[in-house]
Regions:
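Feature responds to low-complexity, polar/acidic, surface-exposed segments characteristic
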Residues: 414, 418-464, 470-491, 497-519
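C-terminal "post-core" interaction segments
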Residues: 27-41, 196, 232-420
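Sec/Tat-exported extracytoplasmic proteins
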Residues: 41-55, 71-75, 87-90, 94, ...
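Flexible, low-complexity junctional segments that flank or bridge functional domains
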Residues: 16, 24-278
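Bacterial N-terminal signal peptides
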Residues: 11-19
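Bacterial N-terminal signal peptides that target proteins for export
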Residues: 1-8
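Short, low-complexity export/processing leader segments characterized by acidic and small residues
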Residues: 20-22, 517
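Stable alpha-helical elements in mature extracytoplasmic
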Residues: 33-36, 56, 60-63, 79-86, ...
Length: 521
């Protein structure tokens, strides 16, 4: 097998993005670098919504002074990594320097490791070391893997541990990064220690790396599951069996060959023609884009749930950015999340813009706002900058990977249709849920869509909010919003209940019955 799909330029580009120009050289090199450093810090101060949210200003200025002390002597590559290490202090996965092409000019070690069963597993090696594939990687040059992740935390842009681990995985074979972090020395071999023995590798120039022969663990797979990631495919749907319908959504982008409206119509027709008990929406390999693309599919979810169909959103460590928003939206629509914690954080900085440093040509992506999903979606209420953790926790195992099985999908095929999500008795009562409960108590009459700017039309509580608005049971707030995801105050709850009683013309006995109904709903 030739390196080039999992490793090489693609991995580095994914970790630190792309492209840059040539760095300045000559007697004015230090001055040019100083200008770039000053420009970077000033632009971050001006454009980032909360630069010092995770690291105090003093630490930024100390790091900047440290970098200034070596501007005249360090290499172009180390200067680029210095810039990224300054950006890493923000603790924002979306704000990063795009130095992938700088790293692509450096050496790459011909091996690979990925995360399975709670440890690092050797997934790529030169042919003479292929017998160690599948073994646990414990150290590089004697540095334990946990310590290596910690060191990468000073270099990469990551706002949660899952994102840090993925960034580490994508840069683990970069000679320049390992040298910068004191794990390896450029020009010297790297010792890889596994549970089955150790071996050494020499870094290869990028131009030779793509042609190097590498044995891969993927070559040992017995088969590939029907739900395997289809790289390059925006979305597709298929029946897995008579009871399970599967949708793979890989990019939050419209497929030019099949716009989402048409795809959603196809899905709806196929669901109506079948007798499915569960629908799986797979977001495990979706790295983001525009969260609005999925709305036509999300609009189908409340009706399915009402008919007794279980709807699962499948998430994993590659679920990121707008795909996180879609996953939380799915829960608000009545779905359940299954899989493993995500690299994308529920609340996060995002909506990026960019600027370019004047001398190096390095482009910097910078967040422009903080996205707090709890202000829009009930399922995001109380969340922090943290991975999205699914209700159903099922991790892909190495044994299943090698056997060609999808651990999560197999579990859902066996258990999903009959699974009942645990109750959340401590969850706060939101304005949206109370509106839904009162609408249900009224018999769930037909209601026009509510006009509120912050109300998602696919949310399970949307009809209730619409009915409450039309009947005067509940009103919006200034600015045309309803704040459905916010916890209802005692005053708001009392007002809504009093208005509901009047609207329904209830007797005292009926009021008591209604209160018992809503408390049990």
């Amino acid at each position: 097998m030739h390196i080039g799909t999992r490793l090489g330029a693609a991995g580095l580009a994914a970790a630190l993005l792309l492209p840059t120009g040539a760095l300045a050289a000559g007697p004015d090199q230090a001055q040019a670098r100083q200008e770039d450093l000053d420009t970077l810090y000033a632009a971050l101060q001006e454009h980032h919504p909360d630069l010092y949210a995770n690291t105090p200003q003093e630490a930024f200025e100390a790091k900047k002074a440290e970098i200034e002390g070596r501007l005249a002597e360090e290499s172009d590559v180390d200067f680029a990594l210095d810039l990224q290490s300054l950006v890493a202090l923000i603790g924002d996965s979306h704000t990063t320097t795009n130095i992938g092409s700088v790293l692509n000019s450096t050496g790459l070690y011909p091996f690979g490791a990925e995360w399975y069963d709670g440890s690092w597993v050797l997934t790529g090696a030169e042919e003479e070391d292929a017998a160690l594939l599948g073994q646990t990687v414990t150290a590089l040059n004697g540095v334990p893997m946990d310590e290596i992740c910690t060191r990468f935390g000073t270099l990469v842009s990551a706002d949660n541990p899952v994102k840090l681990r993925r960034q580490t995985e994508q840069l683990l074979y970069s000679e320049a990064c390992l040298d910068y972090l004191g794990i390896a020395e450029s020009g010297e071999p790297l010792e890889v220690t596994t549970s089955g023995g150790s071996f050494t590798v020499e870094a290869l120039p990028m131009e030779d790396f793509g042609d190097a022969a590498l044995s891969s663990l993927s070559q040992q797979r017995e088969s590939t599951p029907a739900t395997a990631y289809r790289k390059g495919t925006y979305y597709f749907a298929q029946s897995l069996d008579d009871t399970t319908y599967y949708i793979q959504f890989n990019q939050c982008m419209e497929d030019p060959k099949q716009p989402m409206d048409g795809f959603a119509a196809q899905v709806e027709a196929e669901l109506e023609a079948g007798d499915y008990r569960q629908v799986l929406l797979d977001l495990r390999n979706n790295g983001g884009g525009s969260d609005g693309v999925l709305v036509p599919i999300l609009m189908l979810v409340p009706g399915l749930v009402e008919e007794g169909v279980k709807v699962y959103g499948l998430v994993g460590e590659a679920t990121y950015s707008s795909a996180i928003i879609n996953a939380v939206e799915l829960v608000d629509a009545g779905g359940v999340l299954a899989g493993s914690p995500t690299s994308g954080s529920v609340n996060h900085f995002g909506s990026t813009g960019s600027f370019t440093l004047p001398n190096s040509g390095i482009r910097v992506s910078c967040s422009s706002k903080y996205i707090d999903l709890g202000t829009l979606l009930e399922a995001g209420l109380g969340a922090q900058v943290e991975p999205l953790v699914p209700t159903v926790r099922v991790e892909q195992t190495l044994d299943d990977y090698l056997a060609g099985r999808d651990t999560l999908v197999d579990w859902l095929l066996a258990n999903g249709a009959d699974y009942t999500a645990p109750e959340q008795p401590d969850a706060p009562l939101t304005r949206g849920r109370l509106a839904w409960m009162l609408w249900q108590a009224a018999g769930a009459p037909e209601a026009e869509p509510a006009p509120f700017s912050d109300l998602m039309p696919f949310a399970y509580y949307a009809p209730g909010v619409g009915w409450c608005d039309q009947t005067g049971v509940a009103n919006g707030v200034p600015g045309g919003a309803f704040r459905a995801s916010c916890a209802v105050t005692l005053e708001e709850a009392a007002q809504m209940l009093v208005r509901f009683v009047r609207q329904q013309g209830l007797t005292p006995a009926e009021v008591r019955s209604c209160l018992l109904y809503t408390s049990d709903a």
